[in-house]
């Protein structure tokens, strides 16, 4: 790895401060000509007149170095004179880097200049606070990347970030298992952004996700973390215009986020070139290795170079993941932070109801609970639309989303709900994977899920990043066996709902 890429311009051996970095700016001869023109208009700088070229070619390299050094010295001298400083003072060899969005990234007090969001004072569980005490600076990240991390509101790494960031930076394959809502997205986005060479116009990182909404969310996180870097992020998913994606890929793209089918389609057409892609990240890896996606994922890997690095992240790892790991990740670094499956901050209740009483029960929950935002899960598209209509008739604001909606409509609903335009969202399991909306503190399973895996991902939509949350399950007579089985599989306790629920367990 080029050591200059470890520092931002103007710091250490960074491109901005290294006089030996010959590829910077116009060719040397042009610089020399420009320098001579400036000498005629600025006679008081004659002490920096460059020596005439010597005839002995073994001095060429030394002379190039000297000319570059003089250019740097003279540039600093002019800058100081413009600022009204003493002309006779000794110029420094290191140039200051340009300010990024009004922030001088080379300044020693760069942290004080950041526009930090308000501090989140809510209670957090040990799912995200039980760390080793590391700081983001300990990983020697680019200064501009650190600026984006802090401006995103991150204070210090969560446990999954502490484990995965340094290992990913070494180039090792990773198989990481951590709970929903503990910071997995940043755990792979940060090393991906750090390893991208901004000067190289090629796709260097591909992030695969199973749903379109998760692709949009992940690309947004990458853009926010890398906003001070010159890294081009692109998102591509099925259901959107293929023509627009093709046009976009003719422009520079460093990091590509998308669903496997669409990226494979663009790759087969020869539009998406992956020969320089050194890192493949699989978020929600267990879903990506389901029969629906696995053939596309395996075909896509064939287009990557043999030296590629694969990072796999998920909360659950079934047998299919082990088979894939044995084939494509011979010696991965394994991270397992799953001492238990459900988040510590989520309190789970069930209520026995008859099918015809469910809407009435939901109305009672709305009136008694202190809801910031809630997600209500149904098992079918038809039931989603019917329930959303019922909730609206009861006088509560409500959106709904499911897989049969047009992609533009889905995007709009997702965006509006995330921005707080509505308090309640009714949806199918489309919305269970990776969707991170911090304001959601209540999840209601209007229809109880059939599998423990689905249940785990549903309730994980509340209590994000160590905050408190509440999951309420409406259980019919037919669901009682499922309830018992899921409790056993997850090793968790789902309690009967009490007459009054203490707000402190989900609103602190």
UniProtKB/Swiss-Prot annotation:
Gene Ontology terms: biological process: mRNA processing; mRNA transport; negative regulation of translation; P-body assembly; stress granule assembly
Binding annotation for ATP: 178-185
Q: Where is the Helicase ATP-binding domain?
A: 165-335
Keyword Cytoplasm in the entry? The reply is yes
Q: Bias category Basic residues: which stretches? A: 54-64
Task: Give the keywords, sorted.
Answer: ATP-binding, Cytoplasm, Helicase, Hydrolase, mRNA processing, mRNA transport, Nucleotide-binding, RNA-binding, Translation regulation, Transport
* Pfam families attached to this UniProt entry: DEAD, Helicase_C
Spans annotated as Disordered:
1-123
List where the motif Q motif lies.
134-162
Give the residue interval(s) assigned to the motif DEAD box: 283-286
Q: What does this protein do?
A: ATP-dependent RNA helicase involved in mRNA turnover, and more specifically in mRNA decapping.
Notes on the domains: The Q motif is unique to and characteristic of the DEAD box family of RNA helicases and controls ATP binding and hydrolysis.
The protein here is known as DEAD-box ATP-dependent RNA helicase 8
Question: Which species does this protein come from?
Answer: Oryza sativa subsp. japonica
